[in-house]
Each structure stands twice: as structure tokens, then as C-alpha cells.
Amino acid sequence: KPSVRLSMKILAIEFSSDHRSVAVLDGGRLLAEQTVTEGRDTAAVALIESALGQAKVGRLEIECIAVGIGPGSYTGIRAAIALTQGWQLALGVKVQGVDSLEALARGEQAGGRRGEVTLAVDAQRGEFYLAKFELSDDGIRNVEPTHLAKRKEYELLLTAGRPVIGPGLGDTFPAAEHVGCLAAGRSDFVEASQLEPVYLRQLDFVKVPPQREIPPV
């Protein structure tokens, strides 16, 4: 596998919630981050251009795109994947898909939270995506993989007083900064065409391939 250089310029995209964000990193060091809360109405390309401008990094300097693949807003994640596919097609950048709940756990750990915590995302239809992580000084560890749970299981966690966080539960959302930080330490690059949103229930509609947005060189 290709090795990850500490100085690799990373563009990170996290659109799995209504708090959409884009970050530019140099290895694991954050150079710039732009966040909007308008959700799907956000002009994604403008958000990327704003982050690149703030970081003073040109499109051609980006070597890797790290994209949050959910679980979360299927529409938002598909939009982020389409952007990533366009960039790889046009500029040949490396690509990584990052679990959005893992990025959320990384953000909580970086912010000082410790111990076991359940991360929850509303999956609609009375169901929730749940995953459990252990946060420590050494990092994060997934102790219960993401699964689709009924509302009752989610409510039992709340009534039992277990720490539960996630989009819609206070001001906690996956952030592009932490998507990029996770990608900075890895070398599991993929073809952007292989990326798919984390979606644990059977699709009940026909997926139409998204139109790729190819950045001008």
C-alpha cells in the first residue's frame, strides 16, 4: 500500500448531517475548515473553494480527499461522494472513505470526553443507527459496530442514563476536520467509484448515479 506522508495535503468532506463541513489539512494539522448549517441547500463547490482559499492551498496541491460516508443523510453523503468522484477523475487524487460516526467519536475524544459512549443517528422510520466507542487518552476504539436499532432500544439507552450523543442530540455533529485527521494516519486508499454510503437497510428505490462535479484545473 502507498504510505501516508506527514505533509500530504488532504481535503476532507463531511455532509452526513445538516452541519456540512469541508476542511483542508496538512497531514493531521488543520489549515482551514468551513461549516454551514443549511444542509442540502448548501453550494458544496463554493464551500470547498472557501476552505481552499482560507488555507491558501490550490486545487492542484490536494493529494487526497477524505469523505465521510455516513451513516446519516443519504442525500448529503451521495453529494459528497459525487464531488469526490469528480475530483479523482479530473485530478487523480487519492481517496479515502471514513465512517462518520468514527469521525464524531474522534471529535469527542479530541474535545476531552473519556469513557464509553453510544453514538446515535436518526435513520428515520422509527429506527436509529447506533454504535459504541471507548474514548481514552490513547485514542478511540469501536466496541460495538454500527447497527440499525428500533426506537425502543434507543430510548432504553436514554432512560438508563447511558451517554448517548449524535446529530440532533445537542450541538454534536461529525466534522470534516476529524474525517481528515483519521485519514491522515491511514493508507487504505480506494477508487472513488467504489464509495457507497453506510446504509444498513435494504434499498427500496432505484439509485440514479449522481452527476459528477468535475473541478476546473
Predicted regions and their residues:
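Oxyanion-binding and handling regions
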Residues: 4-29, 40-42, 96-217
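Short glycine/serine- and small hydrophobic-enriched flexible loop segments
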Residues: 49-50, 85, 89, 181-185
